[in-house]
Design a protein with these regions (language model features):
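Hydrophobic helical membrane-anchoring modules
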Residues: 175-190
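N-terminal glycine-rich phosphate-binding loop and ensuing alpha1 helix
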Residues: 1-56
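Conserved core of the sugar-phosphate nucleotidyltransferase
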Residues: 77-168
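Residue-level signal for inorganic ion chemistry
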Residues: 37, 71-72, 102, 135, ...
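Glycine-rich "substrate-gating" loop/helix at the edge of Rossmann-like oxidoreductase active sites
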Residues: 74, 170-173
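Short phosphate-binding loop-to-helix
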Residues: 45-69, 76, 82-88
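Flexible, charged surface loops at secondary-structure boundaries
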Residues: 7-13, 61-64, 90-93, 158-160, ...
């Protein structure tokens, strides 16, 4: 018997890119035996997003008149249903939607001389994860991406367009090295 997975989002369609540039070789590390970049691509497909190549001309993305989902392969286990929820929120609000995680580390302010000052309230802080979903109107209003660093991109977009954040589940966390990949692998073991 053939098993068919349901497409989670297929309203009017959306395009998606796995943004691997500027991330070194880490997108090709293995999690559960698969490259992080492959895991990210599968999540886009399962969310009903049509994947396009990072090299697709920006003008073609504008002409498509569809939302654009940017997915970071360093958040490889972001669930498809979360990506679909971000696309749905983008369609409902016409705002840029950014996946975020709470900051759990203790943060300290440092003065100009490098002297540690006060503890920063981490409740007000969020770590940008994945995805970032751009409504078609925002895609049309840009000449391209200002950055492929998601934190920088989110800040740039927030300065120019309405932005809504959605809290990503724990498995949507960002990895920064092979040790983080092992932690994520343990977190998502089935």
């Amino acid at each position: 018997a053939t098993s068919v997975r349901p497409v989670l989002y297929d309203e009017d369609g959306s395009l998606g890119v796995v943004v691997e540039s500027g991330r070194g070789s880490l997108p090709f590390a293995l999690c559960h035996g698969e490259a992080l970049v492959a895991c990210a691509a599968w999540a886009l497909g399962e969310a009903g997003v049509t994947q396009v190549d990072m090299g697709t001309p920006w003008e073609a993305l504008v002409e498509a008149e569809e939302p654009l989902v940017l997915h970071d392969p360093l958040c490889p286990m972001t669930p498809a249903d979360f990506i679909a929820a971000c696309v749905e929120r983008c369609a409902a609000t016409q705002a840029v939607v950014v996946g975020v995680r709470p900051v759990t580390d203790t943060l300290k302010a440092v003065d100009a001389d490098g002297v540690v000052q006060d503890t920063v309230d981490r409740e007000a802080m969020r770590q940008v994860t994945s995805p970032i979903v751009l409504p078609a109107s925002v895609v049309a209003g840009l000449a391209g991406l200002a950055s492929t660093d998601f934190a920088e991109l989110a800040a740039d977009l927030a300065a120019r367009f309405p932005v809504v954040t959605l809290e990503a589940p724990a498995e949507g966390r960002r990895v920064g090295d092979e040790d983080d990949v092992r932690v994520l692998e343990a977190l998502t073991a089935r």
